From Swiss-Prot:
Single biological process term from Gene Ontology: methanogenesis, from acetate
Role of this protein: Part of a complex that catalyzes the reversible cleavage of acetyl-CoA, allowing growth on acetate as sole source of carbon and energy. The alpha-epsilon subcomponent functions as a carbon monoxide dehydrogenase. The precise role of the epsilon subunit is unclear; it may have a stabilizing role within the alpha(2)epsilon(2) component and/or be involved in electron transfer to FAD during a potential FAD-mediated CO oxidation.
Family: Belongs to the CdhB family.
UniProt-recorded name of the protein: Acetyl-CoA decarbonylase/synthase complex subunit epsilon
Pathway(s) the chain acts in: One-carbon metabolism; methanogenesis from acetate
Keywords (A to Z) from UniProt: Methanogenesis
Subunit annotation: Heterotetramer of two alpha and two epsilon subunits. The ACDS complex is made up of alpha, epsilon, beta, gamma and delta subunits with a probable stoichiometry of (alpha(2)epsilon(2))(4)-beta(8)-(gamma(1)delta(1))(8).
Organism this protein belongs to: Methanococcoides burtonii (strain DSM 6242 / NBRC 107633 / OCM 468 / ACE-M)
Keyword Cytoplasm assigned: no
Presence of the UniProt keyword Transmembrane in the record: no
InterPro entries listed in its UniProt record: CdhB (IPR003704), DHS-like_NAD/FAD-binding_dom (IPR029035)
Signal sequence, start to end: none
Length: 171
């Protein structure tokens, strides 16, 4: 078992709602139990072939709808993933709207899973979602994402791949 929450320190002032550190097996089970999940993939998956491979495996094994942000669309389409392109800021605005019917028109999402984004970028996007929506967010990034509902801790690239493998095994 990969311990991705070891040595994770959460610093916040009084009243701050911060992300809970989560183990990969728990994250995998939560994704499986979500009624209407959305996998939001960023362009950083293209910088590492192993990360791209794991993101495709997660999407296919859990049968997740995929929102491709940045230029991540190219890597996903080449591998046969049915992804929809959308700007991450526009997506965050839509996700806060209770009347939005989703990328496929089947209704609002209840859980989002994020992978392949810059920490400083996705943390700000999730800040808005945390404050203005009831969505659960699971950050399976290499860095701890403070504004997600749950997040992996700060881990090395090798441990991150191991954690994603464990998550995939629990989908």
């Amino acid at each position: 078992m990969v311990d991705v929450i070891k040595n994770t320190q959460i610093h916040c002032t009084y009243g701050c709602k911060s992300s809970k550190a989560v183990q990969p097996d728990v994250a995998g089970k939560m994704i499986s139990k979500a009624k209407r999940p959305l996998f939001i993939v960023g362009s950083q998956i293209l910088k590492d072939e192993e990360l791209l491979k794991r993101s495709i495996e997660i999407a296919k094994k859990a049968d997740l709808p995929v929102a491709a942000t940045g230029h991540s669309m190219s890597g996903l389409v080449d591998q046969g993933v049915n992804a929809k392109y959308i700007n991450v800021h526009a997506l965050a605005t839509y996700l806060c709207d209770p009347n939005w019917t989703g990328l496929d028109g089947k209704g609002q999402y209840d859980t989002i899973i994020v992978l392949g984004h810059f920490k400083y970028y996705i943390d700000q996007v999730l800040s808005g979602l945390k404050s203005f929506s009831k969505l659960k967010s699971i950050a399976i990034e290499r860095e701890y994402i403070q504004n997600a509902t749950m997040s992996f801790g700060n881990i090395t690239p090798a441990v991150h791949i191991e954690a994603l493998d464990e998550l995939i095994d629990n989908l």
